[in-house]
Amino acid sequence: MLRGCGEVGAVDCSPEQLNKHLKMVPGGRKHSGKSGKPPLIDQPKKAFDFEKEDKDLSGSEEDAVDEKTQVFDKHGKKRSAGIIEDVGGEVQNMLEKFGADINKALLAKKKRIEMYTKASFKASNQKIEQIWKTQQEEIQKLNNEYSQQFLSVLQQWELDMQKFEEQGEKLTNLFRQQQKIFQQTRIVQSQRMKAIKQLHEQFIKSLEDVEKNNDNLFTGTQSELKKEMAMLQKKVMMETQQQEMANVRKSLQSMLF
């Protein structure tokens, strides 16, 4: 009966059913003992029947023999009831010990799950913080780089404007030359504007690339975390099954041996 405990479709292994089953065992042994050897109660009766042929046996002696047989029956019943109670108590103690072992295993499993979960969350938080720091460093680097480029372009533009003013003052009498220089300056300004526009577009594109890379990193980290959690769950389930099988083996060995 105990070998099927915990399996699907197995018999009920509750303490009440086990006590009921074990209480039935001494009765069966007592019955088999009766089949191999005649009970002691019948022996006095047979002796009494054998001696009954003596016609000198008095009525008081017959009463004494009957009282002895009744006392023997009472002691036999009390002894068998005591054996049943002792076996039931031992089984109850074994069941309580088995339940205590299961509770200890469950507590140990709970502690391991909490420890693995805390370690996984700590590792994931560290990865996220590292990604965030990397993103901030890249953004700061881009800001510094393009800020310097913008500043150099603006400084160059200011220098060009200063040259244009100087040339305008010097070439007031030379309209054609001034007109040519103006046209050249406009071309230069348009080129500078194009350069600024290109730098701005490159800056926006770089920011988008950084965001895409960070999204990919977050996605990869999330998938790795899911894989780690799945492996952790599988590992915990395997350890739990092994621990439960070991507890069941110990309990069965202690009950059988």
Curated annotation (Swiss-Prot):
Composed of a long central coiled coil domain. The N-terminal and C-terminal regions interact with DNA. Component of the synaptonemal complexes (SCS), formed between homologous chromosomes during meiotic prophase. Required for centromere pairing during meiosis in male germ cells. Required for normal meiosis during spermatogenesis and male fertility. Plays a lesser role in female fertility. Required for efficient phosphorylation of HORMAD1 and HORMAD2. Residues 87-244 form a coiled coil. Its main location: nucleus. It holds the Pfam family Cor1. It is found in: Nucleus; Chromosome; Chromosome, Centromere. The keyword Transcription regulation does not apply. PANTHER family: SYNAPTONEMAL COMPLEX PROTEIN 3, XLR/SCP3/FAM9. Residues 43-58 have a biased composition (Basic and acidic residues). Residues 23-34 have a biased composition (Basic residues). Keywords: Cell cycle, Cell division, Centromere, Chromosome, Coiled coil, DNA-binding, Meiosis, Nucleus, Phosphoprotein. One of its GO terms (biological process) is chiasma assembly. Residues 74-79, 109-112 are annotated as: Interaction with DNA. Residues 90-95, 252-257 are annotated as: Important for oligomerization and fiber formation. Belongs to the XLR/SYCP3 family. GO terms for molecular function: DNA binding. The modification Phosphothreonine is found at T221. InterPro entries: XLR/SYCP3, XLR/SYCP3/FAM9_dom. The lineage of its organism: Eukaryota, Metazoa, Chordata, Craniata, Vertebrata. It comes from the Eukaryota. A motif (Nuclear localization signal) lies at residues 109-112. The modification Phosphoserine is found at S14, S58, S60, S80. One of its GO terms (cellular component) is condensed chromosome, centromeric region. This is Synaptonemal complex protein 3.
